Swiss-Prot record:
Keywords: 4Fe-4S, GTP-binding, Iron, Iron-sulfur, Lyase, Metal-binding, Molybdenum cofactor biosynthesis, Nucleotide-binding, S-adenosyl-L-methionine. S-adenosyl-L-methionine binds at residues 41, 81, 134, 204. Belongs to the radical SAM superfamily. MoaA family. This is GTP 3',8-cyclase. It comes from Paracoccus denitrificans (strain Pd 1222).
C-alpha cells in the first residue's frame, strides 16, 4: 500500500478528539421516542410521537453505532423514550454484543423498568452487566402521578429480575422539590437494603414544562447533599465512571451515592460523550441546540467514509460546555426539545 494511502486509512479510524482535547469514548443512542410512561418532567401526556418512517431502522442503528465503535467509542448506552418498547429491540442488543471485547468495553441501557422482567435474561445474555433504572419515588400513588401511566409494582418486579439475572442496578432519581423531598432517606435506605447504587439528578430545563413550574420543582443537590450529611458521614470518592456524576460513600452503609448537577456544578470539563437521537441527529452537547444530521450520509449509500467524515465534522463543533443556569429566576439555556427524543 502506498504511504499516502496507508496514512489516509489510519486517519479514517483515528480516535475522536474534540476541539478541547477531550476524547469522545461514550455514545448514548436513543432507539425510540416512544415510552409507556408520560413522566411530567419528560413529555406531554398526549405526546405526538415521530412518524415511524423518520426513525432509524435497527440495521441503520447497528451501522451507525458500529461506526462510532470503530472511531474509539468504548461505552454504548441505549436510551429512549423507553428503549425496551422498541419492536425487536433485542436484535439490536445482540448485534451490538459482537463489539464487546472488540473495541467496546461496555453495553448498557437506561430504562424505566417496566419491561425489565420480560427482557432481563436476554439482556444479560447479550453482555449487559449494568442497567440504570429511573425511579423517583417508592410511593405507589406518587409514582402513578409523576409517570401518569406507570405502575410501581411492575417496575420493582423488573428491578428484581435484573438483579436475579446478574446485572448491577443503579437507581436514577430526579430530585423534585415538593414531590420526593420527604423520601430522601427512604430511597437511600431502600437502595442500601437492595444493594443498588443511587444517583440523584437535578431537573433539567428541557421540554414543555413552564419556567415557573420547573423552578418551583427545582431542588438544588447541594441542599440534598447537606441533608444527607446531617445523618451520614459522606466521604468523597475520586471515582469517575465516564459520566457526569460525582460520588460519595456513606460510611455508615458503605453505599455509593452519585450527584448529577448540571445546573449548580458545570460538569463539562471532562465531557467524553455525545448523543444520537432515534432519527439520526447527533447532538454534541445536551444543553445546546447544535446538531448534525447523520441519517443523510447513512442512507446515501453503503460506503461508511462519508458517515465517518460527517461524524468527525460534528465532533469538531462540540462546544466547551452547556448554558444551563438556575442561579437567576430566568432559566438561561432552556432547550425546547423533549428528553424522550434526544435520549435520556
Amino acid at each position: 500500500m502506498p504511504a499516502h494511502a496507508y496514512l489516509c486509512a489510519m486517519d479514517a479510524h483515528a480516535p475522536l478528539i474534540d476541539p478541547f482535547a477531550r476524547p469522545i469514548t461514550y455514545l448514548r443512542v436513543s432507539v425510540t421516542d416512544r415510552c409507556d410512561f408520560r413522566c411530567t418532567y419528560c413529555m406531554a401526556e398526549h405526546m405526538q410521537f415521530l412518524p415511524k418512517r423518520d426513525l432509524l431502522t435497527l440495521e441503520e442503528l447497528d451501522r451507525l453505532c458500529s461506526a462510532f465503535v470503530g472511531l474509539g467509542v468504548r461505552k454504548l448506552r441505549v436510551t429512549g423514550g423507553e428503549p425496551l418498547v422498541r419492536r425487536n429491540i433485542m436484535e439490536f442488543f445482540r448485534a451490538m454484543s459482537r463489539h464487546l471485547g472488540a473495541g467496546l468495553d461496555e453495553l448498557t441501557l437506561t430504562t424505566n423498568g417496566s419491561q425489565l422482567a420480560r427482557f432481563a435474561t436476554e439482556l444479560a445474555d447479550c453482555g449487559v452487566r449494568r442497567v440504570n433504572v429511573s425511579l423517583d419515588t417508592l410511593d405507589e400513588d406518587r409514582f402513578a402521578r409523576i409517570t401518569r401511566w406507570g405502575r410501581l409494582p411492575q417496575v420493582l418486579q423488573g428491578i428484581e429480575a435484573a438483579k436475579a439475572a446478574g446485572m448491577r442496578v443503579k437507581i436514577n432519581t430526579v430530585a423534585l422539590k415538593g414531590f420526593n423531598e420527604d423520601e430522601l432517606f427512604r430511597l437511600v435506605g431502600w437502595c442500601a437494603d437492595q444493594g443498588h447504587d443511587l444517583t440523584f439528578i437535578e431537573v433539567m430545563p428541557m421540554g414543555e414544562m413552564g419556567e415557573e413550574e420547573r423552578l418551583d420543582q427545582y431542588w438544588a443537590l447541594s441542599d440534598l447533599r447537606d441533608r444527607l450529611g446531617e445523618r451520614f458521614t459522606l466521604t468523597p470518592l475520586a471515582e469517575r465512571t465516564g459520566g457526569p456524576a460525582r460520588y460519595v460513600r456513606l460510611d455508615e452503609t458503605g453505599q455509593k451515592i452519585g450527584f448529577i448537577t448540571p445546573l449548580t456544578h458545570n460538569f463539562c470539563e471532562s465531557c467524553n460523550r455525545v448523543r444520537i437521537t432515534c432519527t439520526g441527529e447527533l447532538f454534541m452537547c445536551l444543553g445546546q441546540e447544535d446538531r448534525a444530521d447523520l441519517r443523510a450520509p447513512l442512507r446515501a449509500g453503503a460506503e461508511d467514509a462519508p458517515l465517518r467524515a460527517a461524524i468527525r465534522d460534528a465532533i469538531a463543533r462540540k462546544p466547551k460546555g452547556h448554558d444551563f443556569d438556575y442561579s437567576r429566576r430566568h432559566v438561561a439555556g432552556q432547550v425546547s426539545r423533549y428528553m424522550s427524543h434526544t435520549g435520556g
